[in-house]
Amino acid sequence: MAVSSGNSSVNSSKKLFSGKKGQSIGIVRSMNYKIPGTFGLESGKTLSGVRVEYEMYGKMNADKSNVILICHALTGDAHAAGFHEGDKKPGWWEIVIGPNKAFDTEKYCVICSNILGGCKGSTGPSSIDPETGKHYGISFPVITVKDMVNAQKKLIEHLGVKQLFAVAGGSMGGMQVLQWTVSYPEMVRKAIAIATTASTTPQQIAFGAIGRKAITDDPKWNGGDYYGKEIPSQGLALARMIGHITYLSDASMQNKFGRLQQDTDKSGIKGTTGTEGKNSSEISSEISSISSEISSELSYDFTPNFQVESYLNYKGDNFTKRFDANSYLYITKAVDYFDLAKNGSLIEGFSGVTAKYLVISISSDWLYPPYQSQEIVSALTANGVDARYEEIRSQHGHDAFLLEEGQLSYLLRSFLSHILVSDVMNRNFYTVSRDETIEHSSKLMVKECVSHLPVISEDGKLEGIVTSWDITKAVACKINELDEIITRDVKYVYEDEKIEHASSIMEKHSISALPVIDSEHRIIGIVTSESISALFGKYD
């Protein structure tokens, strides 16, 4: 295993992350949420009755602070892990989601939803327009990645989650991660963007345009009105074949196929259905099936001679059985429109981001090359954002984020487990000044349900702390002035210190809360044993 950049040590992974081997989450079920009222789009148009398909793995803790949102790629869906009843194959990111895996469902509640515009349960062009009673087709309004994120936000709010512990995704899923932190910075603590870009390039737009033209030039597309009729399978299959080439690398194609020829005498030419949206074991078995029939004879006609041809043909054909052609048009268009630069500056575009970032590239990815991930990190760090860059060394190309279990798991675990005080502290807190009365402080504690009140000076600097126990003693001793009961030798922490340090101080001094201060001794938050337990109570 090799990982470049960052401060992580791959060789130490066994020491850092020992324990049980990851297991499947088991049987899961899909759920569907209907957004009430109308849903506004970036284009200015609206949709009614928007539905969002989603799956949830693991349980939310008491204050719902352990939720991780997974964003899927172009043709993925909400089924990221586990098995549906009767299925033999698990979700598309099974390698990292489940008990004792990187996204540990014993610790986190993991949610994945199908994007707006998709065809796997969420509202898209194949859905029924409530105004006409017919399929939307191309009357469905053009959407953007921002629209997708806005729909996800509606779901997250519906579930009662105020802040996501993390948002993660690869490829177009990575675009959604970036958009989340730009649109809703206060709602995301940690962001994991894998094999993605902050601004779609001309080459990437070109591949999308060719794929769309393959679909719209298919006579059976019929202007997008093919529902209940024969689908534009030829165009959709060709679009998928074109797209899938960009997911592989030259080295991976050489290793998988070389110039091996296909035995065309067989009644069926073996092939695979493509990797995106599939788990690693399924991908491996499909590729192996290609190698089972090899010929050294050239056909001297236009039937597929080479195994790579068979692979792409069957990949395209099988894709038409699970995906809607119009959805492909809309989603690739949304990818084309994606550009987080503001006034031509990505630094300006990221100016409001506050989440801690892990940006991962893949060494052999030529669809979203490493330099694009490096540009993201540079723009983030220019804004003072804590952003870490890592590169997965792999010959699998863009698809490596679905295949490289070892490297990916190490990076994810390392990033998620590196918890600082700033990740847990409460930035909405109440304070008092030392000239306040006991009565005022007591009423404030009762009203706001808090047991600790930091005492601050006029310029916001920490002077001490008062607890509910101090108030109780003051009442018993008939003390009226707050200044008489303040603890002045108060323990505190800084926001960039590890949460383990805060926890050890609490344990050593038998206290349940610590003020968080900045370099000028001004209070900026408070961390409590309750908040630590709420997020990490299941960790051991």
Curated annotation (Swiss-Prot):
The active site consists of 171, 365, 398
Q: What does this protein do?
A: Transfers an acetyl group from acetyl-CoA to L-homoserine, forming acetyl-L-homoserine. In vitro, can also use propionyl-CoA or butiryl-CoA as acyl donor.
Give the pathway listed in the UniProt entry for this protein: Amino-acid biosynthesis; L-methionine biosynthesis via de novo pathway; O-acetyl-L-homoserine from L-homoserine: step 1/1
* Ranges of residues in domain AB hydrolase-1: 66-404
Q: Which organism is it from?
A: Methanosarcina acetivorans (strain ATCC 35395 / DSM 2834 / JCM 12185 / C2A)
Lineage top rank: taxon: Archaea
What is the name of the protein in this document? Homoserine O-acetyltransferase
Transcription: is it a keyword of this entry?
Answer: no
